[in-house]
Structures are given as C-alpha cells and as structure tokens.
Design a protein with these regions (language model features):
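Conserved beta-strand segments of alpha/beta enzyme cores
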Residues: 106, 267-269, 359
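Inter-motif core of Ras-like GTPase G domains
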Residues: 284-308
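Generic enzyme active-site microenvironment
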Residues: 270, 304, 330
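Switch I (G2) and immediately adjacent beta-strands of P-loop GTPase domains
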Residues: 51-63, 67-71, 251-279, 297-300
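Glycine-rich, N-terminal phosphate-binding loop of Rossmann-like dinucleotide-binding domains
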Residues: 88, 238, 273, 305-308, ...
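Short glycine-/polar-rich loops that comprise or flank the Walker A/P-loop
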Residues: 16, 48-50, 297-301, 324-327, ...
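A glycine-rich (often HGG/GG-containing) alpha/beta subdomain
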Residues: 1-144, 148, 152, 328
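C-terminal-of-GTPase-core extension/linker across diverse P-loop GTPases
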Residues: 2-9, 13, 37, 140-262, ...
Length: 462
C-alpha cells in the first residue's frame, strides 16, 4: 500500500453549511502549512487542537476555515491527520481540495482512509465494514447494530472463539512434537466437547444473520388480497401519502407498487400487488402471477380480507400462499357490516393444516383504525420484538456469515475425525481451517486482493 499523503472531501457533495477536506499521511501537517494562513504554523501547534485561518492558493484567498490538527497514532487512520472545515458549497469545497492536491497530496481512493485505519491496526476488518454500514443504515436497528460492531462486538466474539481453537491446536501440535512428555491419550473426548461448544457458538452467530439481514436490508413485505379488499388504501396509510390509486373499480392495481417505510425502528420494503382473482385480462393476469412470485420470496405477508364480503375460491388461493410464511391477516372494512369473523379465518387456517398462530386483526383502512395494532404486531414478529445490543452480537454481512459457515463445517470435521478414531494430526488440520476461516472475518487471514475489493465499495472520503 502507498504510504504517501492522501486527501479527499469527507462530506457529501451538496451545498451545505460546512464541508470537510481530510488530509492523512506522513506529510499531512507540512502540506496543510503550504495552503493554510493563520496565527501559527500547523506543524507547530499541539495535537487535537482547532485553529482559525484561511486557505490560500498562492496570493488568492480560497476560503475562511477552521483547521483541526491531529497527530498520529491517536487518529482515525493512525497517521497525522488534518481536517479543513470550510464553507459547504460544492465549488468552494472542491477548490479547497484542489489547492491541497496542488500542495502535494494525492487524491484518496474510495475507502482509503478506513483501509489505512485497518492496515495500521486501528480496527479489524469487521469494524472497518461496520463503518460503511453506519453510513448506509436506514433505520434505528441497523444503526445500533453497526455501532455495536464498530465498537468491537463481532471482533471480540470471534477473538474469543479463535482463542479456544488455537489453544487445542497448540496442545495437539506440542504433543505430537514431544510425545515422550505430553500424552494425547483421552484428549479426543476433551476436544470433542470443546468442538461442540464452538459449533454452538458459531450456530448462534450464523442464526443471528437472519435478524442482521432484516435490520440491514429491511423486511420484504407483500400485501395480498382480492380486488378491492383495501390493499392500496393500506399501503397509502403506511406510506403516509397517496402512493396507490384507490377506486371502487376492481382490478385498479394491475402491476406491483413498491414503497419503503419506517415502522418502529424497522424498515419495511412493501410491495402492493394486483388483487388475486381469476381473470381473462392479460395485463391483470400478469400482475396476479407477479403477486404470487413475490409472495414466495417475502419475509412477511399482509393478507387483507374484505370482511364485508364472503370468502370464496380466490381466498383459498391466497391461503395456499401464506401457510409457510410469517403472516398477518387483516379483516378490513370493520366500519361496515361484516360477514367474515376471526373464527372463520382460523377455521380455514386449521383446514389447511397450519399449526402456527397467525395474528388476525380487525381494521378499517378507510377510518385508519387498527393500524397501531398492526404496527405493534409486525414489530413483535421480527427481531424478538426488540433487540439488546449490550450482549447480543448480530451478523449483518454475507461475507462474514460465509466465513462462519466454513468454520462450523471444519469443526464438524474435527468431531467426525475423533469419532472415526483418526490420527490427531487430522484434528489439527481441521482446527486450523476453522481458525483461518474466522480470521477472514477480522482480517487476520485475508489476502490483499480481497482487502482491496472490500474497501473499493466504500464512498470517497471515507
């Protein structure tokens, strides 16, 4: 990696109150001195101090600024760092950066500041990946999970598991090198118990990835129902604006409508679908087929029943789509005379052989009644109703999950080798495979190409 001094704009490229140009590297202070005019030289002021002055391009004043000076290694990157706080217009920030680059800095690559923090030991790879997750978080849970990982929750848990693995690996290797003084007789049972404990810990982390994905990507939510059941009205209420056209004409929604909403700290990626019914209209039929496809991939199905009309064969088709999904059934139009009851719905569910308890809620989309109960029910169905980031660790990253799965498979091989009575060096091989897989999460067992690929996904200036 280049150790030259880099610079980039660290704030968004939009007109705003303040813009920040960050400089990091061995010559950050000297380069800042070449463009900064104030009462004192940047190279002479104490670390972690802020100074008022101007950025100069020769004799021309570019902007009035506050400059933050930080000496390494007590910085984000571990290097000498200067952050120039200027006015936030896109042109003036670009001019400040241009002036800094003319003074000797190199334009930073995407994610290069965080990459340097990783390479300089300021954070491990799981924490580095959490940086981008903080930036891209779209709800409270995603943010808190990312902050927890940035503070070292994943790093510490992986470190704990790796220490157990390397302890047993070291014992076996030492015993094989010095059999006269160290015996491995009976050690297989000790190792098997330890391996089973590690597998349980890995399983817990792997299982957390489902919650992690939902926190990060949102709940894929599909609204199903017959035509004119009130699906589009429900979407409009949840979205807080008129996203869908609502009429008394059946089949108004022919294609899918997508909307992202925030619900009590969660993100719902909602898809409003065409009403499920038998139709000869080619376009509407395509919409119905699409609705069925989306239902298969959904994390959550909200089935809207028009409680003022009797159930029919179209409802039977919808019941077939929801039996293996997390589902909330809404008895809509509770403000009218209703003919469909919760008992009738539960009887239909029972006839389908569904054992799980499906929430059934009476609502009126027209009067906006029952919506709060729907929100509370959805939250309770996901993330155990609420989450604690004090002790729980959540995996939100597919790369990390794959590494955990690989480590678990290696530990299963250890147990297989023990049960099969294979030589102890077989145990050691699989233990080290698990150790290396977990090292991929923290970055201790990862190649330069993968490091470059990970950081290339970061935004400029971070």
């Amino acid at each position: 990696m280049n150790q030259d001094t880099i610079a980039a704009i660290s704030t968004g490229m939009t007109n705003s109150g303040i813009g920040i140009v960050r400089i990091s590297g061995s010559e950050a202070l000297e380069i800042a001195d070449r463009v900064y005019k104030g009462k004192e030289m940047i190279t002479e002021v104490p670390t972690h101090t802020i100074h008022y002055g101007h950025i100069m391009d020769g004799d021309e004043t570019v902007d009035e600024v506050l400059v933050m000076v930080m000496h390494g290694p007590r910085t984000f990157t571990g290097e000498d760092t200067v952050e120039i706080n200027c006015h936030g217009g896109t042109y003036v920030v670009s001019r400040v950066l241009e002036t800094v680059l003319k003074a000797g800095a190199r334009p930073a690559e995407p994610g290069e500041f965080t990459k340097r923090a990783f390479l300089n030991g300021k954070m491990d790879l799981s924490q580095a990946e959490a940086v981008i997750d903080v930036i891209t978080s779209e709800n409270e849970y995603a943010l808190q999970s990312s902050i927890s990982q940035l503070k070292g929750s994943v790093k510490n848990r992986i470190k704990e598991i790796r220490e157990k693995i390397i302890y047993h690996t070291a014992f076996i290797e030492t015993a094989l090198d010095d059999p006269e003084h160290i015996s491995v007789d009976g050690y297989g049972e000790v190792l098997k118990e330890a391996a089973e404990e590690v597998i349980d810990q890995l399983k817990e982390l792997i299982d957390s990835s489902d919650d992690g994905r939902i926190m990060k990507e949102g709940i894929q939510t599909v609204i199903l129902g017959k035509p004119n059941a009130g699906k589009s009205s429900l979407l409009n209420i949840l979205a807080g604006h008129d996203r869908a056209i609502v009429t008394d004409i059946e089949g108004t929604t022919r294609d899918v409508l997508e909307e992202q909403i925030r619900l009590q700290g969660l993100t719902l990626n909602i898809i409003d679908t065409a009403g499920i019914r038998q139709t000869d209209d080619i376009v509407e039929k395509m919409g119905v087929d699409k609705a069925k496809e989306y239902a298969k991939e959904a994390d959550l199905i909200i089935y809207v029943v028009d409680a003022s009309r009797n159930l029919d064969e179209n409802d039977e088709k919808i019941f077939d789509l929801i039996y293996d999904k997390r589902t909330v059934i809404l008895l809509n139009k509770s403000d009218l005379d209703t003919v469909v009851t919760e008992e009738m719905i539960r009887e239909r569910i029972s006839q389908k052989g569904v054992q799980k308890q499906i929430p059934v809620i009476a609502i009126s989309a027209k009067e906006e009644q029952g919506i709060k109960e729907l929100e509370n029910t959805v939250k309770a169905m996901f993330l155990k109703g609420d989450l604690s980031f004090n002790e729980e660790v959540y995996i939100t990253n597919a790369r990390q999950k794959n590494a955990l799965v690989n480590a678990r498979e290696s530990m299963k091989k250890v147990i297989f080798s023990i049960d099969a009575g294979m030589p102890e060096d077989f145990y050691s091989i699989d233990l080290m495979d698990a150790y290396e897989s977990l090292g991929n999460i923290t970055g201790e067992s990862i190649g330069e190409d993968l490091v470059n690929e990970i950081f290339s996904k970061f935004c400029m200036g971070k």
